[in-house]
């Protein structure tokens, strides 16, 4: 049976202009990304982090390198995200946090912001269908926040915890202290952060939870994700000494 194409077109203050993604293509692409195996090497891992953060950078650069408009990179980043989610489930990771887009990102051209917002909607609903206990964290009062994700502003589901940062800003997060607590208070301390695209920075990614996190950088661009990237990050983490400042 042919899966329907996904069309997002809304008449509201935070409308996403007409952006169409082919769900069948996305699912086919994610299925081709072989998940991290649960063989003896994975099962004998001495240190499986409880909470891992992911910064999937390089969508626009990937699009340009492949002769596409920059906004097309975001669609090609959905399937890797689904495959990464499945790999984390297989490994028994309890909680993951994923950068969708930041408040600063919304300054990009409209075509790009429409596409990354729509891509976030597709990804969020797909992992929710796959059993994620999903929390979308970001400024929902802004017109840049996709209305389709409002239902996930309180955590939904009972599986692996996924904190999806959508229209997130570190200042917005910390401003919650004026009202009694971090806006990300429900998110636990990070053990490991993995960033694609070669950047050596956190870009405001959960600054409080990141305080003792080890950081692993992957040079490949996000749409070129392969499960071996995650395996490499976890193997590297086993060699680190988690002193937590002690």
Task: Label each PLM-derived region with a short phrase.
Residues 1-31:
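N-terminal amphipathic/basic-hydrophobic helices that include classical n-h-c signal peptides
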Residues 26-246:
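Flexible, compositionally biased loop and terminal segments
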